[in-house]
């Protein structure tokens, strides 16, 4: 980007708390290089306000989820979860000039790694291309997929005429997860 040898460049990276996905973006680096080149020989400090950061950031991907399930008494015997969103990995890699060769696992994050044990369980993720830049906001796919998943569990509890917490506990065989839900 600069045309300079790496030995002529010094970068002092600030330690920060949660970057929430923002550290994966390179636009701030390009801006810092432009400012440094315009002020040759002068050390620079580039800081974005929270408002500037949010203005220049990529969006969280829009998503859609659909669940089909089968109840047998108070147990879920089949859970078929489909989710679609744009690919964060594809969008971020594209901004760096790369393409991803296959599926983006972030689309199904939070959909399959659940403590519930169903006799029949399927998760399908669909990449839905959009023309809007998307980025890895905190938890990427788990945000929307956990919402879709848990909302479906609530709806199934309602159909089973069961208390949502008790219904969940009947579906979970992981002791640590049961302990967390029981403690709340």
Where do the language-model regions lie?
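Structural alpha/beta core scaffold segments of enzyme domains
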Residues: 1-184
